[in-house]
Amino acid sequence: LIALQDLAERPVWQSPDLQLLMRRPASDLLRYRASSQVQYRYDLSLGKWRQQQLASLPAGSNPRTVAWAQAWWQKTAAQQPQVDKTALAQQFAQYLLSTLHAENYRYTLNPGLYGQHSADEFWFDKKEGFCEHIASSFVIAMRAVGVPARIVTGYQGAEQNTVDGYWAVRNSDAHAWAEIWLQGRGWQRIDPTGAI
């Protein structure tokens, strides 16, 4: 969703990175008008410091995921030396989506508790979770190979009121997905939950 008019007078505001945020929790119905720019490209150029920040992981974080991702990256890069980092990042993202689909990962709202290395548990042990587990595990794998990535939260889906044409978006429509940053293309949305 892109800019709202007269944001200062409304309970919703737009952050510098284009998030729509509420000034306080919603307790009543909220109506606003917004438009969606499906092909909008954001942050086509991202400074080196910001790239490094968005491609880093805490030391010792999810060691199995890091080793698995780096092994795939090194093997594929060696087999395809002519392929640049952007194309390799796209291939790796597709590999992760294919893995989620082909290896019977499961969506559940009751995955139990995850420990300190949640991506390791998701990719190699439990193989189940809800959108936050799936998106964060995807982002951790992408960052493990140096690709700037982030988790995005918002809403997916809504119900249209046939009387007045408005769309009702409920808390049950809350969702998390991922974005990866690619040189010259900016942030690219990827919903790894959709692969399950």
Predicted features, each with a name:
Residues 91, 132-133:
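Residue-level recognition of alpha-helix initiation/capping sites
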Residues 2-125:
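Acidic low-complexity segments
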Residues 121-130, 165-169:
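Short, contiguous acidic/charged loop-to-helix segments that flank catalytic cores in large enzymes
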Residues 133-196:
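Hydrophobic/aromatic-rich core segments of domains that either
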Residues 39-42, 102-106, 114, 129-130, ...:
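Solvent-exposed loop/turn segments at secondary-structure junctions
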